[in-house]
């Protein structure tokens, strides 16, 4: 958990590429920043060495008419008004937990086995686990064990520490899954019906740096694998 808090602290600091004349200020959610953007920053630096990015971590909406922020990545339905909105990708969730939890004394063979484990909830999205369980054909009854945390970032970190099972964005956790830090006990993916979007001030003429970041993040999103084949990840098939 301390590692996750350290990551958030780092994420709130300014991140810059090589100094250049074109500066772009960007606001993104901490989870998106630490799990998706930061691991890919070197590719942006290599492709656009003359663009400087100043990135801050925030989940709030930006008033681009008053803020110095040039661009932001929002998570939602894409129905914000008076800003330019560009779709990046849909968000799907899968259950994730630590490898140790999978090999413990309470095996996870089928979704109903989750009743014997702690479910980790994001406090503002308590509906997610009941919806996933309904999709899996399991009634949300008998789940007395639970842990509520304030963000997806902390929920995923808690799962990695073996504190329970969390629902996580399948793309944002792909590195931890590939590295064996997290495992997917069941391969049932739930469509959140929400997406990531790149947004900025309406009718704004993009600078070279803003256009560069826009082109790059859209390309990277297209190249991002949602999740590896379940056989490679060693997950249980949902049945």
Q: Could you tell me what each predicted segment is?
A:
Residues 25-27, 72, 120, 166, ...:
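Short, well-ordered beta-strand segments
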Residues 50, 170-179, 189-239:
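C-terminal effector-binding regulatory domain of bacterial HTH transcription factors
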Residues 141-184, 191:
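Hydrophobic hinge/microswitch elements
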Residues 86, 112, 156-157, 211:
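Alpha-helical segments flanking ligand/cofactor-binding loops in enzyme cores
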């Amino acid at each position: 958990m301390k590692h996750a808090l350290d990551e958030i602290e780092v994420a709130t600091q300014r991140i810059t590429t090589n100094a250049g004349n074109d500066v772009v200020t960007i606001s993104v959610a901490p989870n998106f920043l630490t799990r998706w953007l930061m691991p890919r920053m070197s590719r942006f630096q290599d492709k656009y060495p003359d663009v400087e990015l100043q990135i801050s971590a925030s989940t709030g909406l930006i008033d681009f008419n008053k803020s110095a922020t040039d661009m932001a990545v929002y998570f939602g339905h894409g129905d914000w008004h008076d800003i330019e909105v560009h779709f990046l990708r849909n968000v799907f969730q899968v259950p994730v937990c630590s490898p140790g939890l999978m090999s413990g004394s309470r095996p996870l063979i089928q979704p109903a086995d989750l009743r014997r484990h702690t479910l980790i909830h994001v406090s503002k999205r308590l509906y997610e686990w009941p919806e996933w369980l309904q999709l899996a054909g399991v009634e949300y009854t008998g789940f007395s064990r639970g842990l509520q945390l304030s963000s997806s970032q902390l929920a995923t970190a808690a799962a990695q520490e073996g504190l329970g099972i969390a629902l996580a964005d399948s793309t944002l956790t792909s590195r931890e899954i590939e590295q064996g830090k997290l495992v997917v006990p069941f391969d049932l993916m739930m469509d959140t019906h929400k997406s990531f979007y790149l947004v900025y001030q309406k009718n704004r003429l993009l600078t070279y740096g803003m256009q560069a970041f826009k082109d790059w993040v859209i390309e990277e999103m297209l190249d991002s694998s949602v999740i590896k084949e379940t056989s490679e990840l060693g997950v249980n098939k949902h049945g």
